[in-house]
C-alpha cells in the first residue's frame, strides 16, 4: 500500500487520500543549504529543492495517513551539514530517508534519476532492509513523473 503514495505523488493526483502508511515516518532532506551548489544564471539548487521538500511534506500530511514527516531544514537561512542531516535522521529512526537534489549538467541531453540505498561492504543490505527494493520500484515512477528519458 505504501507504494501507492509515491504513485499518487508523482502523477500529481490531487485530493486522493492514500492509506496504509499509518505507523510509518519519513525523513525529507532538501539537499544542500544556503548558497551551496549555485548553478549558472544564479540558479540555487538549495532554494529549489527546499520548496519541493516543503510541498512534499504538505502533500504527505494532507493526502495520506502517514504518522510523522521530518525535514532537515525549513528555510533558506539554515545551514545544515551532511553529518547533521544523517545524524538527525538516524536519531529519530525514520523509516525512509528521502534526499532531494536537482543535479544539472552543461550537457542538455543528459537527464537522469538517481536512487541510492544503503549496502554494507559484504553486499548485504544496510538496515532497515528494503531500500534496494523500494529504489528499484521508485526509479521508473520518479523518472516518468519528472518526464525524464
For the regions a language model picked out, list residue spans one by one:
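Intrinsically disordered, low-complexity segments enriched in small/polar residues
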Residues: 1-4, 68
Amino acid at each position: 500500500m505504501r507504494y501507492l503514495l509515491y504513485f499518487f505523488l508523482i502523477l500529481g493526483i490531487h485530493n486522493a487520500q492514500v492509506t496504509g502508511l499509518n505507523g510509518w515516518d519519513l525523513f525529507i532532506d532538501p539537499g544542500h543549504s544556503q548558497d551551496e551548489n549555485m548553478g549558472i544564471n544564479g540558479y540555487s539548487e538549495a532554494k529549489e529543492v527546499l520548496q519541493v521538500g516543503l510541498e512534499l511534506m504538505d502533500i504527505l500530511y494532507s493526502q495520506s495517513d502517514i504518522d510523522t514527516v521530518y525535514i532537515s531544514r525549513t528555510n533558506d537561512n539554515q545551514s545544515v551539514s551532511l553529518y547533521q542531516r544523517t545524524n538527525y535522521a538516524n536519531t529519530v529512526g525514520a523509516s525512509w530517508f528521502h534526499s532531494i537534489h536537482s543535479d544539472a549538467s552543461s550537457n542538455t541531453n543528459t537527464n537522469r534519476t538517481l536512487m541510492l540505498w544503503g549496502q554494507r561492504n559484504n553486499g548485504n543490505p544496510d538496515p532497515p532492509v528494503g531500500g534496494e527494493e523500494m529504489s528499484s520500484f521508485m526509479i521508473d515512477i520518479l523518472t516518468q513523473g519528472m518526464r525524464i528519458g
